Amino acid sequence: SVAETMYKLTGMVMMVAPYGVFALIAVTVSKYGLSVLAPFAKVIVAVYVGCALHALVVYSGLVTVVARRSPMWFFSGVKESMLTAFVTRSSSATLPITMRCAKENLGISEKISSFVLPLGATINMDGTALYQGVCALFVAQAYGIPLSLGAQANIVLTATLASIGTAGVPGAGLIMLTLVLTAVGLPIEGVALVAGIDAVLDMARTCINVTGDSCVASVVAATEGETLSR
């Protein structure tokens, strides 16, 4: 299938990515100096805090208002899939565990979970969109490029659209980041700055992506009249 072909191509790219990252970082540092590497910690904190707030505010709100269940019930039910996603950095690899948690812990039917969760693992990438937006701003600041309000809005739109087409495999978000940077006229070499910490960022965004899939499945189940577990 087309999806499997894309996964294999992505895997091939990621195998040689470290060599390309080293070369890009060498060029960037030689041109702009070591000071350009200093804000990495801020990027990591921004992505992790953003993901945490998204889960605690958006997902908790949806579960409470629509599914009529407590956030503690939800996060307790999906903690295994969240941990697996954090470790594997792959929505696709986590999918079997996500489906099992949805059925056994949340009480979502096979009919809904087997449709919503695989679809979500393909197109529902909240964490990836957040990550791409933060990284685009980081690249702009690192290169001293001012962004107008329109450019920032363009980043939000492009990051959202690019995340929908991101494969659920480790490192795929970094490849799609090039589209976001190109769309707003930022230097594509900025990907090298992000690549050095991408594995750390990938853990958080994949965890949020998978959690969002389970949240949507819970909401769909509730709106379809199913009785969720307590």
Regions found by a protein language model. Name each.
Residues 3, 41-58, 77-83, 153-164, ...:
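Small-residue-enriched core segments of transmembrane alpha-helices in multipass membrane transport
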Residues 11-15, 49-50, 64-74, 106-113, ...:
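Membrane-interfacial loop-to-helix junctions in multi-pass transporters
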Residues 133-230:
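Transmembrane alpha-helical segments and their short flanking loops
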Residues 1-13, 33, 37-44, 74-78, ...:
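Hydrophobic alpha-helical segments of integral membrane proteins
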Residues 1-73:
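Signature of multi-pass transmembrane helix bundles
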Residues 13-23, 91, 220-230:
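Transmembrane helical cores of multi-pass ion-transport proteins
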Residues 80-163, 217, 228-230:
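Helix-loop-helix junctions within the multi-pass membrane cores of secondary transporters/permeases
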